[in-house]
Amino acid sequence: MATQAVQVFGKKKNATAVARCVQGKGLIKVNGVPLKLYAPEILRAKLYEPILLLGTDKFAEVDIRLKVSGGGHVSQVYAVRQAIAKAIVAYYAKYVDEHSKNTLKTALIQFDRTLLVADPRRCEPKKFGGKGARSRFQKSYR
């Protein structure tokens, strides 16, 4: 029998995290590093949000391996947490049942919508007449 696997991605600004969720024993690795060792310690709590919210029992029978690139540290953490949440929902939708998928989805959306839906905000391009997108050079009348 072929392995039960789903592949999803999470995005934030320029950071993209690709998650592959397969049947396993609860292993979660980001770029080959275990989740408990990844990222600055302060941001690690953000990574654990979908896991703590849904309960570790939901993640006990799956392995999630993620590859993240682009963006900064914070963007990468947000992309990873989105990929983890989307991966577990997609796995439950495909291989478990529709009812449990819906309960997972509603729990995630009630907590934080960006766990499943990408943030559309992007950096606005710079325009002439100033040093940024909106700021203008100082005007002198005399």
Swiss-Prot record:
Classification via PROSITE patterns: RIBOSOMAL_S9
One Pfam family per UniProt: Ribosomal_S9
Role summary: Component of the ribosome, a large ribonucleoprotein complex responsible for the synthesis of proteins in the cell. The small ribosomal subunit (SSU) binds messenger RNAs (mRNAs) and translates the encoded message by selecting cognate aminoacyl-transfer RNA (tRNA) molecules. The large subunit (LSU) contains the ribosomal catalytic site termed the peptidyl transferase center (PTC), which catalyzes the formation of peptide bonds, thereby polymerizing the amino acids delivered by tRNAs into a polypeptide chain.
Gene3D superfamilies: 3.30.230.10
UniProt family annotation: Belongs to the universal ribosomal protein uS9 family.
Subcellular location: Cytoplasm
A Gene Ontology BP annotation from the UniProt entry: translation
Cellular component GO terms, alphabetical: cytosolic small ribosomal subunit
Assembly information from the UniProt record: Component of the small ribosomal subunit (SSU). Mature N.crassa ribosomes consist of a small (40S) and a large (60S) subunit. The 40S small subunit contains 1 molecule of ribosomal RNA (18S rRNA) and at least 32 different proteins. The large 60S subunit contains 3 rRNA molecules (26S, 5.8S and 5S rRNA) and at least 42 different proteins.
Key words of the record: Cytoplasm, Ribonucleoprotein, Ribosomal protein
Primary location group: cytoplasm
Keyword Zinc among UniProt keywords: no
Protein name, entry field: Small ribosomal subunit protein uS9
Species assigned in the record: Neurospora crassa (strain ATCC 24698 / 74-OR23-1A / CBS 708.71 / DSM 1257 / FGSC 987)
